[in-house]
């Protein structure tokens, strides 16, 4: 018996799930081993190139997904065609809105990404049968609501410097690998997208990035690679 099959029989967990970040996430972490095996049988891993849309606003999606790797940006398109980035999602976030067929947002890969896709009808059934999964999704919805309120504060009351620092902190806290005090990551958004997300001009974003570099809060390599030598210092900038 090979190691993979042995691991399955010993743990009852599908091999593909054992090293997956989402195994203990909002959805999979609330499932029984039997449910996890059933979900795994119907799931498909997909690699998504940056810029590819996985859910279109107004469309009826037949699937949900967990982010395995990469960053997704959530966008809202106005009737006149103007677009606003309204959120970012990272591994191992759950993408989708249970029991609502028509998507109110679009989801697009901001970076090269990998997702685990599974049928909407299957998970909807599991939700209706599993109180623990219902609670998990409810708790996640409340966390997202709290995060949205915090972001409203950022956009409405924080300075341009604090806005840029807040976005960098958001990305940094989801970056891997990271130590207790420092981290490094590639920006998943262009300067124009950052400006759109924060309600600033591109020039203001560039000036604030330069200022953060000059005072030593960040280091910038190859334009998009960011090093945060002291996470505590970055956090102090947005907690003042």
UniProtKB/Swiss-Prot annotation:
Q: Please list which residues make up the signal peptide.
A: none
Gene Ontology CC annotation, any one: cytosol
SMART domains cross-referenced by the UniProt entry: cNMP, HTH_CRP
Is the Transit peptide keyword given for this protein? no
Q: Which residues bind DNA?
A: 191-210
Enumerate the GO terms in the molecular function aspect: DNA binding; DNA-binding transcription factor activity
* Domain HTH crp-type intervals: 158-232
Location of the region described as Essential for the oxygen-regulated activity in the Swiss-Prot/TrEMBL record: 17-28
Q: Which Gene3D superfamilies match?
A: Jelly Rolls (2.60.120.10), Winged helix-like DNA-binding domain superfamily/Winged helix DNA-binding domain (1.10.10.10)
User: Pfam families, from UniProt?
Assistant: cNMP_binding (PF00027), HTH_Crp_2 (PF13545)
This protein's source sits in the domain of life called Bacteria
**One GO BP:** nitrogen fixation
Q: Which InterPro entries match?
A: cNMP-bd_dom (IPR000595), cNMP-bd_dom_sf (IPR018490), Env_Response_Regulators (IPR050397), HTH_CRP (IPR012318), RmlC-like_jellyroll (IPR014710), Tscrpt_reg_HTH_Crp-type_CS (IPR018335), WH-like_DNA-bd_sf (IPR036388), WH_DNA-bd_sf (IPR036390)
Sorted UniProt keywords:
Activator, DNA-binding, Nitrogen fixation, Transcription, Transcription regulation
Q: List other remarks.
A: Possesses 4 cysteines which may bind a metal ion (possibly iron).
Q: Sum up the protein's function in the record's words.
A: Promotes the microaerobic and symbiotic induction of fixN, possibly by binding to the FNR consensus binding site upstream of fixN.
Protein's UniProt name? Probable transcriptional activator
Q: Which organism is it from?
A: Rhizobium leguminosarum bv. viciae
């Amino acid at each position: 018996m090979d190691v993979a099959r042995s691991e399955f029989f010993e743990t009852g967990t599908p091999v593909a799930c054992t090293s997956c970040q989402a195994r203990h996430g909002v959805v999979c972490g609330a499932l029984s081993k039997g449910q996890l095996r059933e979900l795994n049988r119907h799931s498909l891993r997909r690699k998504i190139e940056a810029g590819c849309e996985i859910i279109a606003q107004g469309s009826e999606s037949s699937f949900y997904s967990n982010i395995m790797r990469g960053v997704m940006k959530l966008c809202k398109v106005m009737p006149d065609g103007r677009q606003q980035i309204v959120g970012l999602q990272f591994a191992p976030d759950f993408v989708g809105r249970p029991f609502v067929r028509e998507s109110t947002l679009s989801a697009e890969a901001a970076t090269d990404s990998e997702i685990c896709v599974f049928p909407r009808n299957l998970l909807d059934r599991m939700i209706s049968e599993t109180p623990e999964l219902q609670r998990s999704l409810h708790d996640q919805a409340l966390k997202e609501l709290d995060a949205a309120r915090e972001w409203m504060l950022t956009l409405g009351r924080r300075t341009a410097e604090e806005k840029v620092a807040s976005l960098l902190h958001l990305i940094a806290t989801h970056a891997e690998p990271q130590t207790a005090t420092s981290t490094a990551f590639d920006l998943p958004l262009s300067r124009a997208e950052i400006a759109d997300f924060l309600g600033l001009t591109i020039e203001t974003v560039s000036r604030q990035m330069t200022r953060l570099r000059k005072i030593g809060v960040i280091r910038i390599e190859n334009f998009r690679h960011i090093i945060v030598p002291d996470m505590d210092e970055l956090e102090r900038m947005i907690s003042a």
